[in-house]
Amino acid sequence: MSHLLRKPQADEISQGVNIIHDVTSANSDLKYVGFKVVDLTPGSAYTEDLKKTECCIVAVTGKITVTDYDQTFESIGTRESVFERKPTDSVYVSNDRSFEITAVSGARVALCYSPSEHQLPTKLIKAEDNGVEHRGKLANKRTVHNILPDSDPSANSLLVVEVYTDSGNWSSYPPHKHDQDNLPAESFLEETYYHETDPPQGFVFQRVYTDDRSIDETMTAENENVVIVPAGYHPVGVPDGYTSYYLNVMAGPTRKWKFHNDPAHEWILER
């Protein structure tokens, strides 16, 4: 199995709290992005001290209460399945703070991390504040929920977005990359993809490759898998009969999403 592909685990760290994914700089090639998925049973709680790290807490499914011990956001979260295709609530918590998540119902929570030195205010990102976009045409159509875009100054480094891609379509396509710290032409952003499929026995194909092919991995990502993108192009293809959801986390030295298309495939945009 590729070192860029992670399968879900169920590591129970306390009663009712299971770590499904935990991607860190210590166990991956990433320096700027960390990613964790936590499942909670009703009434259970997860706590964390952030130190020099910022975090976006995404209520993937279910309802949760989040506190940083100064502010409390009660019973947030909007859906029982990501395939309800409606935006959800999130909470941004800055470095050198602590937080607690308590499950109001059974819940799945994504924790999106990046190193941070400059403390910013804790912020509730309401579902209705997610910018919704419909991108692409032909077999290259997807729907985007912008949770923390680069136009929102709420974070120091993090960018967080949800993407839905319908049956038979491609996403992150034509292949693009953002692995050069060369603004204004291109920014350096690492990335993770947390995948779900509907129906859940489905899968998507994701290729991660660089111009020199020093990275060239084509993976079958099944439901609840994570794909790690330290560099390179990273398109996703969705087979007929299935719908794809993924949650992206990006971060790098500059909080700007400026990508570069693979010149070999850029002609696709001209149709």
UniProtKB/Swiss-Prot annotation:
The keyword Thylakoid does not apply. Signal peptide: none annotated. Keywords: Isomerase. SUPFAM superfamilies: RmlC-like cupins. It catalyses: 5-deoxy-D-glucuronate = 5-dehydro-2-deoxy-D-gluconate. It comes from the Bacteria. Its EC number is 5.3.1.30. InterPro entries: Deoxy-glucuronate_isom_IolB, IolB_Bacilli, KduI/IolB_isomerase, RmlC-like_jellyroll, RmlC_Cupin_sf. It is an enzyme of class 5 (isomerase). GO terms for molecular function: 5-deoxy-D-glucuronate isomerase activity; glucuronate isomerase activity. Pathway: Polyol metabolism; myo-inositol degradation into acetyl-CoA; acetyl-CoA from myo-inositol: step 4/7. GO terms for biological process: inositol catabolic process. Belongs to the isomerase IolB family. Involved in the isomerization of 5-deoxy-glucuronate (5DG) to 5-dehydro-2-deoxy-D-gluconate (DKG or 2-deoxy-5-keto-D-gluconate). PANTHER family: 5-DEOXY-GLUCURONATE ISOMERASE (PTHR39193:SF1). HAMAP family: IolB. This is 5-deoxy-glucuronate isomerase. It comes from Bacillus velezensis (strain DSM 23117 / BGSC 10A6 / LMG 26770 / FZB42). The gene is iolB.
